[in-house]
Curated annotation (Swiss-Prot):
Recorded superkingdom: Viruses
InterPro entries on file: Lentiviral_Vpx_assoc_factor, RetroV_VpR/X
GO biological process, one term: symbiont-mediated suppression of host innate immune response
Protein name as annotated: Protein Vpx
Pfam families: VPR
Keywords: Host nucleus, Host-virus interaction, Inhibition of host innate immune response by virus, Viral immunoevasion, Virion
The protein's assembly and partners: Interacts with the P6 region of unprocessed GAG. Interacts with host VPRBP/DCAF1, leading to change substrate specificity of the CUL4A-DDB1 E3 ligase complex.
Cell compartment(s), UniProt: Virion; Host nucleus
Family assignment from sequence similarity: Belongs to the lentivirus VPX protein family.
Function comment: Plays a role in nuclear translocation of the viral pre-integration complex (PIC), thus is required for the virus to infect non-dividing cells. Targets specific host proteins for degradation by the 26S proteasome. Acts by associating with the cellular CUL4A-DDB1 E3 ligase complex through direct interaction with host VPRPB/DCAF-1. This change in the E3 ligase substrate specificity results in the degradation of host SAMHD1. In turn, SAMHD1 depletion allows viral replication in host myeloid cells by preventing SAMHD1-mediated hydrolysis of intracellular dNTPs necessary for reverse transcription.
Principal location class: virion
Extra information: This is a macaque isolate.
């Protein structure tokens, strides 16, 4: 009987796969941030980013990649809930509680 576990394809090492995963994570965080600013208040995006780093990285001692992953999950959930409630941002603009007047806060560090 053959081993039913999945095998790494020939020519791929675990190191290359991990490096590709980190590149994917960084690309995905940047892409979701570019989309999120079209739907969510910048203040919310910044606060989620900042709190993710404070909690997961600083308080819990998790890695940068894990912290980015948790941030990605939270922003993805926020976008899902926003769209589920009937997104009209791109067609009609934000309603009450969308963008606040005044200059926007800075984007999440390293994701400008």
């Amino acid at each position: 009987m053959s081993d039913p576990r999945e095998r790494i394809p020939p020519g791929n090492s675990g190191e290359e796969t991990i490096g590709e995963a980190f590149e994917w994570l960084n690309r995905t965080v940047e892409e979701i941030n570019r989309e999120a600013v079209n739907h969510l208040p910048r203040e919310l995006i910044f606060q989620v980013w900042q709190r993710s780093w404070e909690y997961w990285h600083d308080e819990q001692g998790m890695s940068q990649s894990y912290t980015k992953y948790r941030y990605l999950c939270l922003i993805q959930k926020a976008l899902f809930m926003h769209c589920k409630k009937g997104c009209r941002c791109l067609g009609e603009g934000h309603g009450a509680g969308g963008w606040r007047p005044g200059p926007p806060p800075p984007p999440p560090p390293g994701l400008a």
